[in-house]
From Swiss-Prot:
GO cellular component, as recorded: plasma membrane
Membrane spanning stretches: 5-25, 31-51, 60-80, 86-106
InterPro entries: UPF0060
Keyword Nucleotide-binding found: no
UniProt KW Transmembrane keyword: yes
Protein name: UPF0060 membrane protein SAR2425
Intracellular or extracellular location(s): Cell membrane
Record-stated family: Belongs to the UPF0060 family.
Keywords in alphabetical order: Cell membrane, Membrane, Transmembrane, Transmembrane helix
Membrane topology according to the record: Multi-pass membrane protein
Signal peptide range in chain numbering: none
C-alpha cells in the first residue's frame, strides 16, 4: 500500500506545484518561464498518475481527489499561511474516509 500512497503524493505535488506556478504567472505577474515550468510540471502529473497499480482510471482519480484535498489544505497552511477552519478539516476527513472505502476492500 506504500507505493500507491507515494504515487498519490508525488502526483499531488506536481499538480499543486504546477498549478501554483501558473497562478503566479497569470495572477501575480511572474514571468512566462514560471508559467511554462508550471505547465511542464502539470504534464508530469498526468504521466505520474498512470503509474498507479489500480486497474480503473475512474477509481484512481476519485481516490486521488481525496488525497489532493488534504495536500491542498497543507499547501495553504505552509505556503499561503492560511489555517483550515473546522469545516475544512471535517470535509477533508470525510474525503479520506471515502478514499479508504474505495481503495481498501478486496474486489474479486
Amino acid at each position: 500500500m506504500l507505493y500507491p500512497i507515494f504515487i498519490f503524493i508525488l502526483a499531488g505535488l506536481c499538480e499543486i506545484g504546477g498549478g501554483y506556478l501558473i497562478w503566479l504567472w497569470l495572477r501575480e505577474g511572474q514571468s512566462s518561464l514560471v508559467g511554462l515550468i508550471g505547465g511542464v510540471i502539470l504534464m508530469l502529473y498526468g504521466v505520474i498518475a498512470t503509474f498507479q497499480s489500480f486497474p480503473s482510471f475512474g477509481r484512481v482519480y476519485a481516490a486521488y481527489g481525496g488525497v489532493f484535498i488534504i495536500m491542498s489544505l497543507i499547501f495553504a497552511m505552509v505556503v499561503d499561511k492560511q489555517m483550515p477552519d473546522k469545516y475544512d478539516v471535517i470535509g477533508a476527513i470525510i474525503c479520506i474516509v471515502g478514499v479508504l472505502v474505495m481503495l481498501l476492500p478486496s474486489r474479486a
